[in-house]
UniProtKB/Swiss-Prot annotation:
One of its GO terms (cellular component) is nucleolus. The modification N-acetylalanine is found at A2. This is Target of EGR1 protein 1. It is linked to Pontocerebellar hypoplasia 7: A form of pontocerebellar hypoplasia, a group of related disorders characterized by underdevelopment of the pons and the cerebellum. Pontocerebellar hypoplasia also causes impaired growth of other parts of the brain, leading to an unusually small head size. PCH7 patients manifest delayed psychomotor development, hypotonia, breathing abnormalities, and gonadal abnormalities. It comes from Homo sapiens. Changing V173G: In PCH7; reduced protein levels. One of its GO terms (molecular function) is snRNA binding. A zinc finger (C3H1-type) spans 294-322. It comes from the Eukaryota.
Length: 510
């Protein structure tokens, strides 16, 4: 629980708090432990004030969900976005949210330009209406530590669709979502279209029939903007891959380099929770990259490209995210060296000054790989694997179709946040970054971290009345598309009736 002071502010953690990122005199970063507060029916009322305080004082809130399934994968990748929206709506009406992750990031300007206090919550939920749960979803979630016995015994109950009477003053998940809207904070997600649709149907109101009406509603619900870290990672940070674990670890590493160089960098602090809350807090480790890592025989091409492997923990190849990023960076550096050598030879042959020859691009991240029609429908939920923009070595390219067929046959609906390892309680004594990280609360933290780092990497923002990070403002990633979904209210779209009624309730009772 966040420590509440008399004036309603969140108290800062002590300087010696184990959750604070620190550096030794030798420059080696200590292990960072991220506290994730578990919220269930048995402590929901106790945590309610802290949840509200964290949301209201945050500068932005990152959200993630675990779902009971998604239904027909092919429809979810329909080239017609309107039809795709209808397919996601059908899934949201027939499936449920099993857990909700919230990560609230509050700026601490007195501690640095890019310093945040992060509070992370993992809410276990239980829909009280009939819903579909898919076997592959169950298998995947159990493999990554989801406790279904605990969910059915202690999940916070909720109902979907429209309100049943005046619920605005009750302590419920639906009211918590209403408080998130009232806070008028930027909402951050990763590959967030599915999350947005499920959040609306499960905690807000019945979904509108058209995508235009849905985006018009969203525009009014979140006036500070909706941000998608997959869009930011792929189109602005230009990472080689953009699945969540890769983007998070890449940002961590780049941030560490900037800190070591004395450049502007992101710093985080976490609340120093009392020992009485120990049973409700799950600490997740963020390890610094190993400088001398034993290299296995090979990296798993599937996991490297898509963030998911059908063999899971039984895969004999490496799923080490740091090793994958090391390999990508080495390949990119080799490519730059070869490009410079070609330029030098061409200049020598043409006897030209050192200007860049035509056809040679500037140094930068590896060129994006366009997947187009080769996308397989099973490669989706919060991530569609074929959308991952890897610049694979030749050996990977040759096996790409086989990998995709393997995914089509065996992949569960959740991929973007999937990791290859067993839950933390069964992890090896020498964990690899990413080991057992898959959880709505920690995924929300990773999502928020990526967005905070993108802010740092873009440099000082001009003082204006415009939106935060305008390049990413109200742009939601669309799998298989070169352009994002823009969240805006067009002159041809009206807000839905259910939304208008909800808005009156929201602001009339605030």
């Amino acid at each position: 629980m966040a420590a509440d002071s008399d004036d309603g502010a969140v108290s800062a953690p002590a300087a010696s708090d184990g959750g604070v990122s620190k550096s030794t005199t030798s420059g080696e970063e200590l292990v960072v432990q991220v506290p994730v507060v578990d919220v269930q029916s048995n402590n929901f009322k106790e945590m309610w004030p802290s949840l509200l305080l964290a949301i209201k004082t945050a500068n932005f809130v990152a959200v993630d969900t675990e779902l009971s399934g998604l239904g027909d994968r092919k429809s979810l990748l329909n080239q017609c976005i309107e039809e795709r929206y209808k397919a996601v709506c059908h899934a949201a009406r027939t499936r449920s949210i099993l857990s909700l992750g919230l990560a609230c990031f509050k700026r601490q300007p007195d501690k640095g330009e890019h310093s945040y206090l992060a509070q992370v919550f993992n809410l276990t939920l239980l829909c009280m209406e009939e819903y579909v749960i898919e076997p592959k979803s169950v298998q995947f979630l159990i493999q990554h530590g989801f406790n279904f016995n605990q969910q059915y015994a202690q999940g916070i109950p909720y109902h979907k669709g429209n309100d049943k009477g005046d619920e605005s003053q009750s302590q419920s998940v639906r009211t918590l979502f209403l408080e998130l809207i009232r806070a008028r904070r930027p909402l951050v997600l990763h590959n967030g279209l599915i999350d947005l649709v499920f959040l609306y149907q499960n905690f807000y109101a019945h979904l509108p029939e058209s995508l235009g009406t849905f985006t018009a509603d969203l525009c009014e619900m979140f006036p500070a903007g909706i941000y998608d870290t997959k869009y930011a990672a792929e189109f602005h940070a230009r990472f080689v891959a953009s699945y969540l674990e890769y983007a998070f670890r890449k940002c961590e590493r780049e941030n560490g380099k900037q800190r070591a160089a004395g450049s502007p960098h992101l710093t985080l602090e976490f609340c120093n929770y009392p020992s009485s809350m120990r049973d409700h807090i799950d600490y997740r480790c963020c390890l610094p990259p190993a400088t001398h890592r034993p290299h296995p025989t090979s990296i798993c091409d599937n996991f490297s490209a898509y963030g998911w492997c059908p063999l899971g923990p039984q895969c004999p190849q490496s799923h080490d995210i740091d090793l994958i990023i090391d390999t990508d960076e080495a390949a990119a550096e080799d490519k730059r060296r070869r490009r410079r050598r070609r330029e030098k030879r061409k200049r020598a042959l043409l006897n030209l000054p050192g200007t860049q020859t035509s056809g040679e691009a500037k140094d930068g991240p590896p060129k994006k790989q366009v997947c187009g029609d080769s996308i397989k429908p099973e490669e989706t939920e919060q991530e569609v694997a074929a959308d991952e923009t890897r610049n694979l070595p030749h050996s990977k390219q040759g096996n790409k179709n086989d990998l995709e067929m393997g995914i089509k046959a065996a992949r569960p609906e959740i991929a973007d946040r999937a990791t290859s390892e067993v839950p933390g309680s069964q992890a090896s004594p020498n964990p690899v970054p990413g080991d057992g990280l898959h959880r709505a609360g920690f995924d929300a933290f990773m999502t928020g971290y990526v967005m905070a780092y993108v802010e740092v990497s873009q440099g000082p923002q001009p003082c204006s009345s415009g939106p935060w990070l305008p390049e990413c403002h109200n742009k939601v990633y669309l799998s298989g598309k070169a352009v994002p979904l823009t969240v805006a209210k067009s002159q041809f779209s009206r807000s839905s009736k259910a939304h208008n009624q909800k808005m009156k309730l929201t602001w009339g009772s605030s």
